[in-house]
């Protein structure tokens, strides 16, 4: 087992370590996901994955990392290699079909309710992105979707340097932001034309995005 990161929780100084997850961790993954869902007041904020979906990722179609206190899984984060279909997020950000195989998705991220407030989301995001960039340049783009007004997830994506490229209906009609981060030639954008717009002005945001603007902070 290769330890990718070691740290201590800010709240109680408990040491934790981060490793890659495999199929042998699937029971712990499902158990932690159930705990996280049960603790949510608004259960629609999280789209849980099924056992089959986790297995698909762990069988070589993505990457999962987990944080452990001794042998207890307290947080995990996943990346998914998506199927090439009409719903592919690469199409939403304007990529040609020939480049869709260069896209990987940020998938689910869960932290045990007792371990929140320790910056685990950010730590796991940094670790998994570092691991991804070691993957022999197989991927050029990371994409994901976030529901409007899911403030923690929006903050999480912006903190990673991801940008909103589209706002459109996905997954059977639900409005979603489509985020993207380019993995190569990663330099800060020097924004020359900046517009501020209210979060509840969806049509105004869509108009700006269609003109080539990107959402970069809130």
Identify what each model region corresponds to.
Residues 2-52, 59, 64-69, 73, ...:
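Short amphipathic alpha-helix that is part of the acyltransferase structural core
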Residues 84, 145, 158-178, 214-218:
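Conserved catalytic-core motifs of GNAT/GCN5-like acyltransferases
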Residues 132-148:
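Conserved GNAT acetyl-CoA-binding A-motif
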């Amino acid at each position: 087992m290769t330890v990718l990161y070691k740290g201590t929780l800010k709240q109680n100084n408990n040491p934790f370590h981060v490793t890659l997850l495999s199929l042998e961790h699937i029971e712990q993954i499902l158990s932690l996901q159930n705990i996280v869902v049960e603790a949510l007041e608004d259960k629609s904020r999280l789209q849980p994955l099924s056992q089959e979906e986790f297995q698909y990722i762990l069988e070589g179609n993505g990457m999962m990392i987990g944080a452990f206190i001794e042998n207890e899984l307290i947080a995990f984060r996943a990346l998914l290699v998506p199927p090439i279909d009409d719903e592919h997020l690469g199409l939403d950000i304007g990529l040609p079909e020939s480049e869709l195989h260069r896209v990987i998705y940020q998938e689910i991220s869960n932290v045990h309710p007792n371990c929140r407030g320790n910056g685990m989301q950010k730590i796991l995001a940094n670790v998994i992105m570092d691991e991804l960039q070691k993957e022999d340049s197989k991927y050029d783009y990371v994409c994901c979707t976030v529901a409007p007004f899911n403030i923690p997830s929006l903050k999480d994506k912006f903190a990673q340097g991801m940008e909103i490229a589209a706002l459109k209906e996905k997954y059977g009609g639900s409005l979603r932001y489509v985020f993207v981060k380019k993995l190569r030639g990663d330099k800060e954008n020097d924004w020359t034309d900046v517009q501020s717009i209210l979060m509840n002005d969806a049509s105004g945001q869509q108009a700006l995005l269609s003109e080539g603007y990107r959402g970069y902070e809130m």
